[in-house]
């Protein structure tokens, strides 16, 4: 099975959206294999968002991500990266379709509730930044046989 990294950002945590977001992924049939709340250290924010280091918005992004607890997760499922990206919607909540996480819960591009890996390669890198292999759990959901065609 494929894996992806998902992070509910401080605005999503502080607005009480964790349960609703997790429920959407579970209802889709995805499997949560790791999760924890954490205020990210600066070093991991820099590593996570290395592609944005030279951009003018990076200092405010870093401050925002470090401004409260995030909920870090690893989800598993077939084509999970693409599925989660569709479920979260466009980066700018004002452009995100209704029914997507950002379309329903996001307000501003600078406070867009959630981050998810954009490729399998990014997923592997981001999971490695935030989780040790021993923190990823293997188990079978009781509904896997009806979620996936084998």
Curated annotation (Swiss-Prot):
Q: Which cofactor does it need?
A: Mg(2+)
Provide the reaction this enzyme catalyses: a 2'-deoxyribonucleoside 5'-diphosphate + ATP = a 2'-deoxyribonucleoside 5'-triphosphate + ADP; a ribonucleoside 5'-diphosphate + ATP = a ribonucleoside 5'-triphosphate + ADP
Active-site residues annotated for this sequence: 115
Q: Which positions bind ATP? A: 9, 57, 85, 91, 102, 112
User: Could you state one GO cellular component term attached to this entry?
Assistant: cytoplasm
**UniProt keyword terms in alphabetical order:** ATP-binding, Cytoplasm, Kinase, Magnesium, Metal-binding, Nucleotide metabolism, Nucleotide-binding, Phosphoprotein, Transferase
A GO BP entry: UTP biosynthetic process
Localized where? Cytoplasm
* Name used for this protein in its record: Nucleoside diphosphate kinase
Any one GO MF annotation of this record: ATP binding
CDD domains found in the cross-reference section: NDPk_I (cd04413)
Looking up Pfam families in the UniProt record yields: NDK
EC id: 2.7.4.6
Q: Which NCBIfam families does the record associate with it? A: PRK00668.1
Predominant localisation class: cytoplasm
What this protein is reported to do is described as: Major role in the synthesis of nucleoside triphosphates other than ATP. The ATP gamma phosphate is transferred to the NDP beta phosphate via a ping-pong mechanism, using a phosphorylated active-site intermediate.
Indicate the secretion signal residues.
Answer: none
For the keyword Nucleotide-binding, the answer is: yes
Q: Which gene holds the coding sequence for this protein?
A: ndk
Which SMART domains does this entry report, sorted A to Z? NDK
Q: Which family does it belong to?
A: Belongs to the NDK family.
